[in-house]
From Swiss-Prot:
Gene3D superfamilies: 2.40.128.20
Reactions it catalyzes: peroxynitrite = nitrate
One Pfam family recorded for the sequence: THAP4_heme-bd
UniProt name for this protein: Peroxynitrite isomerase
Record organism: Kocuria rhizophila (strain ATCC 9341 / DSM 348 / NBRC 103217 / DC2201)
Comment text on domains: Forms a 10-stranded antiparallel beta-barrel structure able to accommodate a hydrophobic ligand in its interior. In fact, this fold hosts the heme group, which is located in a wide surface cleft.
Length: 206
Protein backbone atom coordinates (compact mmCIF):
# COMPACT_ATOMS: atom_id res chain seq x y z
CA UNK A 1 0.00 0.00 0.00
CA UNK A 2 1.41 3.44 -0.91
CA UNK A 3 2.41 5.72 1.95
CA UNK A 4 0.00 8.65 2.23
CA UNK A 5 1.74 11.98 2.79
CA UNK A 6 -0.36 14.68 4.52
CA UNK A 7 -0.83 17.66 2.23
CA UNK A 8 0.25 20.09 4.96
CA UNK A 9 3.41 18.17 5.90
CA UNK A 10 6.54 20.32 5.98
CA UNK A 11 9.08 18.97 3.44
CA UNK A 12 11.59 18.13 6.15
CA UNK A 13 9.23 15.52 7.62
CA UNK A 14 8.41 13.68 4.40
CA UNK A 15 10.93 10.89 5.25
CA UNK A 16 8.92 10.30 8.47
CA UNK A 17 5.49 10.26 6.76
CA UNK A 18 5.02 6.50 7.13
CA UNK A 19 5.41 6.76 10.91
CA UNK A 20 2.86 9.51 11.51
CA UNK A 21 -0.32 8.70 13.40
CA UNK A 22 -1.23 6.57 16.42
CA UNK A 23 -0.28 2.92 16.64
CA UNK A 24 -1.32 0.21 19.10
CA UNK A 25 -0.39 -3.42 19.64
CA UNK A 26 1.24 -6.01 21.86
CA UNK A 27 4.77 -7.11 22.61
CA UNK A 28 7.10 -8.68 25.15
CA UNK A 29 9.74 -7.18 27.44
CA UNK A 30 12.43 -8.61 29.67
CA UNK A 31 16.12 -8.29 30.44
CA UNK A 32 18.71 -10.24 32.35
CA UNK A 33 17.10 -12.05 35.26
CA UNK A 34 13.83 -10.10 34.97
CA UNK A 35 10.72 -12.09 34.10
CA UNK A 36 9.52 -11.73 30.52
CA UNK A 37 6.23 -9.84 30.47
CA UNK A 38 3.60 -9.21 27.81
CA UNK A 39 2.54 -5.63 27.28
CA UNK A 40 0.27 -3.44 25.20
CA UNK A 41 1.61 -0.20 23.81
CA UNK A 42 0.14 2.90 22.24
CA UNK A 43 2.60 5.04 20.27
CA UNK A 44 1.93 8.41 18.66
CA UNK A 45 4.09 10.18 16.10
CA UNK A 46 2.67 13.69 15.75
CA UNK A 47 3.50 16.57 13.43
CA UNK A 48 2.53 20.14 14.26
CA UNK A 49 3.91 22.00 11.24
CA UNK A 50 7.36 22.42 12.78
CA UNK A 51 10.33 20.43 11.40
CA UNK A 52 10.30 17.66 14.01
CA UNK A 53 8.06 14.77 15.02
CA UNK A 54 6.71 14.57 18.58
CA UNK A 55 6.91 11.01 19.93
CA UNK A 56 4.90 9.55 22.82
CA UNK A 57 4.62 5.95 24.03
CA UNK A 58 2.40 4.49 26.76
CA UNK A 59 2.98 0.91 27.89
CA UNK A 60 0.56 -1.26 29.90
CA UNK A 61 1.34 -4.70 31.34
CA UNK A 62 -0.98 -7.56 30.38
CA UNK A 63 -2.10 -10.48 32.54
CA UNK A 64 -1.95 -14.14 31.52
CA UNK A 65 -5.23 -13.77 29.62
CA UNK A 66 -3.91 -10.82 27.65
CA UNK A 67 -6.03 -8.27 29.50
CA UNK A 68 -4.65 -4.94 30.77
CA UNK A 69 -3.23 -5.33 34.28
CA UNK A 70 -1.48 -2.07 35.19
CA UNK A 71 0.42 0.76 33.60
CA UNK A 72 4.13 0.12 33.19
CA UNK A 73 5.80 3.24 31.84
CA UNK A 74 5.76 6.19 29.47
CA UNK A 75 8.37 7.83 27.29
CA UNK A 76 8.38 10.82 24.99
CA UNK A 77 10.72 12.74 22.75
CA UNK A 78 11.49 14.27 19.38
CA UNK A 79 12.51 12.81 16.02
CA UNK A 80 14.18 15.02 13.40
CA UNK A 81 16.63 15.07 10.53
CA UNK A 82 20.23 15.46 11.70
CA UNK A 83 21.60 18.53 9.92
CA UNK A 84 23.46 21.74 10.80
CA UNK A 85 21.08 24.28 12.33
CA UNK A 86 20.73 27.67 10.67
CA UNK A 87 19.63 31.12 11.85
CA UNK A 88 16.07 30.40 10.67
CA UNK A 89 15.73 27.27 12.82
CA UNK A 90 14.04 27.04 16.21
CA UNK A 91 16.06 27.90 19.33
CA UNK A 92 18.10 28.27 21.33
CA UNK A 93 15.65 28.11 24.19
CA UNK A 94 12.17 29.31 23.24
CA UNK A 95 13.29 31.42 20.27
CA UNK A 96 10.88 30.62 17.42
CA UNK A 97 11.87 29.61 13.89
CA UNK A 98 11.34 31.86 10.89
CA UNK A 99 7.84 31.63 9.37
CA UNK A 100 9.32 30.11 6.20
CA UNK A 101 10.98 26.71 6.84
CA UNK A 102 14.71 26.39 6.26
CA UNK A 103 14.00 23.48 3.90
CA UNK A 104 11.17 24.55 1.60
CA UNK A 105 11.07 21.82 -1.05
CA UNK A 106 11.62 18.14 -1.73
CA UNK A 107 14.78 19.12 -3.60
CA UNK A 108 16.18 20.75 -0.45
CA UNK A 109 15.52 17.57 1.53
CA UNK A 110 16.98 15.28 -1.14
CA UNK A 111 20.32 17.06 -0.79
CA UNK A 112 20.54 15.59 2.73
CA UNK A 113 20.52 11.95 1.61
CA UNK A 114 23.54 10.08 2.93
CA UNK A 115 25.83 7.63 1.12
CA UNK A 116 23.47 4.74 1.98
CA UNK A 117 20.53 6.47 0.31
CA UNK A 118 18.81 7.30 3.59
CA UNK A 119 18.67 10.34 5.86
CA UNK A 120 20.68 10.85 9.04
CA UNK A 121 18.36 11.48 11.99
CA UNK A 122 18.58 12.31 15.69
CA UNK A 123 16.05 11.09 18.25
CA UNK A 124 15.86 12.31 21.83
CA UNK A 125 13.83 10.22 24.29
CA UNK A 126 13.09 11.01 27.93
CA UNK A 127 12.12 8.22 30.33
CA UNK A 128 10.79 8.41 33.89
CA UNK A 129 13.37 7.64 36.53
CA UNK A 130 15.86 10.25 35.38
CA UNK A 131 17.14 8.78 32.11
CA UNK A 132 17.47 10.70 28.83
CA UNK A 133 18.76 9.16 25.60
CA UNK A 134 20.10 10.76 22.44
CA UNK A 135 20.01 8.37 19.50
CA UNK A 136 21.69 8.88 16.14
CA UNK A 137 20.93 6.77 13.10
CA UNK A 138 19.17 6.81 9.79
CA UNK A 139 15.74 6.52 8.22
CA UNK A 140 15.73 4.79 4.86
CA UNK A 141 12.35 4.15 3.33
CA UNK A 142 10.13 2.38 5.90
CA UNK A 143 13.02 1.45 8.23
CA UNK A 144 14.78 3.22 11.09
CA UNK A 145 18.05 2.14 12.74
CA UNK A 146 19.13 3.95 15.91
CA UNK A 147 22.04 3.71 18.35
CA UNK A 148 22.60 5.81 21.46
CA UNK A 149 25.15 8.59 21.09
CA UNK A 150 24.69 9.78 24.67
CA UNK A 151 22.84 8.74 27.82
CA UNK A 152 22.21 11.14 30.71
CA UNK A 153 21.26 9.72 34.11
CA UNK A 154 20.16 11.71 37.12
CA UNK A 155 21.76 11.01 40.47
CA UNK A 156 20.13 7.88 41.83
CA UNK A 157 18.85 6.69 38.44
CA UNK A 158 19.13 3.02 37.57
CA UNK A 159 22.21 1.97 35.63
CA UNK A 160 21.70 2.21 31.87
CA UNK A 161 24.64 2.39 29.47
CA UNK A 162 23.38 2.26 25.89
CA UNK A 163 20.68 1.08 23.54
CA UNK A 164 19.76 0.34 19.96
CA UNK A 165 16.30 0.57 18.41
CA UNK A 166 14.98 -0.74 15.12
CA UNK A 167 11.67 0.24 13.53
CA UNK A 168 10.20 -1.09 10.31
CA UNK A 169 6.94 -1.13 8.40
CA UNK A 170 6.02 -4.72 7.48
CA UNK A 171 2.64 -5.47 5.86
CA UNK A 172 1.36 -2.13 7.19
CA UNK A 173 2.35 -3.06 10.75
CA UNK A 174 4.96 -1.12 12.71
CA UNK A 175 7.51 -3.58 14.08
CA UNK A 176 10.09 -2.40 16.58
CA UNK A 177 12.85 -3.94 18.69
CA UNK A 178 14.92 -2.44 21.50
CA UNK A 179 18.22 -3.84 22.76
CA UNK A 180 19.93 -2.31 25.77
CA UNK A 181 23.02 -2.54 27.96
CA UNK A 182 22.13 -1.97 31.62
CA UNK A 183 23.00 -3.13 35.13
CA UNK A 184 26.54 -3.95 34.02
CA UNK A 185 25.36 -6.37 31.32
CA UNK A 186 26.22 -6.46 27.63
CA UNK A 187 23.85 -5.22 24.93
CA UNK A 188 20.98 -7.73 24.75
CA UNK A 189 17.33 -8.04 23.76
CA UNK A 190 15.02 -5.96 25.93
CA UNK A 191 11.65 -5.50 24.19
CA UNK A 192 9.81 -5.78 20.89
CA UNK A 193 6.28 -5.24 19.61
CA UNK A 194 4.02 -5.30 16.58
CA UNK A 195 1.71 -2.29 16.27
CA UNK A 196 -1.21 -1.43 14.01
CA UNK A 197 -2.10 2.12 13.03
CA UNK A 198 -5.41 3.01 14.69
CA UNK A 199 -5.47 6.73 13.86
CA UNK A 200 -4.01 8.44 10.79
CA UNK A 201 -1.77 11.47 11.00
CA UNK A 202 -3.66 14.53 12.22
CA UNK A 203 -3.35 17.80 10.27
CA UNK A 204 -0.82 20.22 11.73
CA UNK A 205 -2.30 22.55 14.31
CA UNK A 206 -5.29 20.28 15.02
Amino acid sequence: MPIEIPTDLTPELVPFAWLLGTWEGNGFMGYGDAEQRAFRQRVTFEQTGLPFVIYRAQTTLLDEEGEPQREATYEQGFWELARPREDGDIGPGMLPPDPVPVLTSAEDVEKLRNADGGFDISVSILQPGGVAELYLGQIKGPRVDLRTDAVIRAQGAKEYQSGTRLYGLVNNHLMWAWDMAADGRELATHASAELTRIEPAAPSGS
